[in-house]
Amino acid sequence: MRIRTEEKIKPTNAELKKILNIGIKLSTEKNRDHLLAFILESGMDITHCDASTLYLFEDGKLHFKIMKTLSQNISRGVEGEPIDNMPPVPMTERNVCSYAALHREIINIPDVYDNTRFDFSGPKKYDALTGYHTQSLLVIPIENNEEELIGVLQLLNAMDETGKVIPFDAEYEIIIRSLGAQAAIEITNLKYVQEVKRQLRSFV
């Protein structure tokens, strides 16, 4: 397991162009649900991974907001619809996403089946039921510019050009965290605008 907080990166020109385009899109998207879906899909695209889950931090817990697995054609919550039968994740040290949120740290695990630091009984149970195989994992806490926790992005099973599952390259960690921070600012701004509109309506 690697827990990282800072590292220099040297993206290729193509990757840099993609990142800049994503940044522009993040700054112009005004629909909250579309923005959240774009965060998840951008993270998957940049890291070339098969699956991802986006959690939002509300009421002291991490709530499932969006889940997507390409190889199984699974897409839930993308249009803002609630994800049923998925209880909130409590903030405990043994849960990898909760740990990342509590300590505001990036967590990069090459193979969850070799890791004993965190409790992966949930993913292992899912694998046993569905035939999926969770292997590599990258967890990024999402904070706004006031260091408020907005949520957590969990990316699963990075793949090489042949489709083989590989560990997540460390160079993507800061890229994803930076995009997450920008997205968090936009989410906070949208929340502020909605609150102002609500207050204005209360005076009418």
Which residues make up each language-model segment?
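Signal-transducing coupling segments at domain and membrane junctions
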Residues: 105, 110-136, 158-167
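Regulatory loop-to-helix N-cap segments in sensory/regulatory domains
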Residues: 3, 133, 148-150, 156-179
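GAF sensory/regulatory domain recognition
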Residues: 41, 53-92, 105-107, 114-115, ...
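Short regulatory alpha-helical segment in sensory/regulatory domains of signaling proteins that mediates
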Residues: 23-30, 39-48, 54-56, 101, ...
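Signal-transmission linkers at sensory-effector interfaces
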Residues: 1-34, 45, 65-66, 189-204
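Signal-transmission/dimerization alpha-helices at domain junctions
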Residues: 1-6, 102-106, 174-196
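A short, aliphatic-rich beta-strand micro-motif
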Residues: 135-144, 151
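The cytosolic transmitter module of two-component sensor histidine kinases
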Residues: 28-32, 36, 93, 169-172
